[in-house]
Every structure is written in structure tokens, then in C-alpha cells.
């Protein structure tokens, strides 16, 4: 079994990349995550409307923290208000262990997978653990 992320991408059942525009409502982001049973969405620039023009990431954890602080009314706010702007990424050539170490070091559960400047996937901690 290969140890790099590329092999994981090739063996995935599907590799749709789920993203939302930064001016979308948090409620809309929650619906996309729920419908697709995912824990994070990449956030792209609303001006270009290009999912490759990444600006951040929003996770279930971001939503929970928002609701605990401001209540469910805050779900009408825009995604850009809670997204993390620092997108941490790996390349397809990165090993699974390096990716897991990066997640643990940064206390995150999702990594963007970038091949040069192109987004090719999103890797979750669950994806990695399934491979152990």
C-alpha cells in the first residue's frame, strides 16, 4: 500500500470538492455539510465565483463555536465572518504520516490538497484514520 496522499485520492469512492462563496449564509454552509456528510467547506471569493480562488475554510467546529456564543440567529451571518483564513495544505506527494502530523500540530481535522496551484481535494482526519 502506497504511503502518499495521491494513492488515497485515487482510492477514494468520490472526490467532489465542496466549497461555498464567502458571502453565503452560515446556514447554507451547514446545509451543504449536512447533505454531503462532511465536516468542512472551502470558502472561495464571491467576486470571482471561482472555487479555485480560495479564501478560507469553515468547519463544523466554527459553526458550533458561533452558535454557543451568539445563538442560532447568527446562522444568517455570512461565512466570511467565521471562516479560518489560513488554509493549511499538502501536496499529493505528501505522505499520510506527514499529513497526520500536520493536522495534529495545527489542531485541525481537514487539509486542502493542492497540486501546484490547483485544488485537487480535501483530506480529512477520518480519511487518514481509515487507512491505518
Predicted regions and their residues:
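Tandem CBS (Cystathionine beta-synthase) repeat/Bateman regulatory domains
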Residues: 1-132
Amino acid at each position: 500500500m502506497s504511503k502518499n496522499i495521491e494513492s488515497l485520492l485515487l482510492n477514494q469512492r468520490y472526490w467532489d470538492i465542496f466549497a461555498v462563496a464567502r458571502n453565503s449564509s452560515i446556514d447554507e454552509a451547514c446545509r451543504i455539510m449536512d447533505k454531503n456528510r462532511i465536516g468542512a467547506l472551502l470558502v472561495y471569493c464571491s467576486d470571482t465565483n471561482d472555487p479555485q480562488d480560495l479564501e478560507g475554510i469553515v468547519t463544523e467546529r466554527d459553526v458550533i463555536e458561533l452558535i454557543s456564543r451568539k445563538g442560532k440567529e447568527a446562522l444568517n451571518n455570512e461565512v466570511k465572518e467565521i471562516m479560518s483564513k489560513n488554509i493549511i495544505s499538502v501536496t499529493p506527494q505528501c505522505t499520510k504520516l506527514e499529513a497526520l502530523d500536520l493536522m495534529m500540530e495545527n489542531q485541525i481535522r481537514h487539509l486542502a490538497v493542492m497540486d501546484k496551484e490547483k485544488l485537487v481535494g480535501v483530506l480529512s482526519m477520518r480519511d487518514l484514520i481509515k487507512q491505518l
